[in-house]
């Protein structure tokens, strides 16, 4: 009864490889002066040879002011007062598995005509690709302060940061439709994010032994497009250089 059902089977397989090396150097002088250097060397098969490997360094330093000798008389009131600063790079392989290679898609039961009562298998000609795609790079700069007062009952931290995302994957400038295919994506977009975060907490114990804690978190951030060449006419329906994400 009812309409017959034609069973179909579909499948997909892809393969890609990553490899990375990581190193870290720490220095701590009497808990007052802190220094750290990191290095990453990452590779991905999603890019062509020559663009597969990239080095991503980072560095951070801290000064625990509360451990200085001139702070000893008020250590009961100020248990921690640490200033932090850091700068670093990370990579993002934000591309498809075979996006730098021309591939032919094959689809079963996909034709608009029938052969022996069944839709035939179809294949699509490959489009244009960019052979120069490479890693997106996220550059982060952060300044922070950790504090704890009143025998660590009042504690918190404040961070101010700037994060720049370089060489994001974006659409290339449009070409005439007579080309007959879509324009490939390229590393042509940059984004800058500015923000801050504040965390304040209070932990204490009542006279009956009951412990309690409360915390408050505040944050704000905005992102600005600093490079986007695919909208030279500044069309409102597309991203614009200098525009803040989310602006109306």
Feature-to-residue mapping (PLM):
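Extracellular/periplasmic, surface-exposed regions of secreted and cell-surface proteins
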Residues: 1-248
């Amino acid at each position: 009864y009812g309409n017959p059902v034609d069973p179909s089977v579909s499948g997909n397989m892809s393969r890609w490889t990553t490899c990375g090396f990581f190193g870290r150097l720490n220095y701590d002088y009497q808990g007052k002066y802190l220094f750290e250097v990191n290095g990453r060397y990452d590779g991905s098969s999603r890019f062509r040879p020559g663009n597969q490997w990239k080095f991503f360094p980072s560095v951070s330093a801290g000064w625990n002011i509360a451990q200085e000798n001139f702070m000893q008389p008020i250590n009961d009131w100020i248990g921690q007062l640490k200033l932090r600063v850091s700068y670093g790079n990370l990579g993002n392989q934000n591309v498809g598995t075979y996006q730098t290679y021309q591939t032919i898609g094959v689809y079963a039961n996909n034709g608009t005509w029938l052969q022996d009562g069944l839709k035939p298998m179809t294949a699509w000609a490959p489009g244009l690709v960019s052979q120069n795609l490479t890693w997106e790079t996220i550059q982060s700069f952060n300044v922070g302060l950790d504090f704890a007062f009143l025998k660590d009952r009042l504690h918190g931290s404040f961070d101010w940061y700037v994060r720049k995302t370089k060489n994001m994957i974006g659409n290339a400038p449009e070409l005439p439709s007579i080309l007959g295919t879509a324009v490939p994506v390229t590393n042509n977009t940059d984004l800058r994010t500015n923000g801050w975060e504040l965390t304040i907490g209070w932990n204490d114990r009542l006279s009956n032994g009951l412990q309690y804690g409360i915390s408050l978190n505040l944050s704000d951030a905005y992102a600005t497009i600093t490079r986007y060449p695919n909208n030279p006419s500044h069309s409102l329906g597309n991203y614009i250089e200098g525009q803040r994400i989310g602006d109306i």
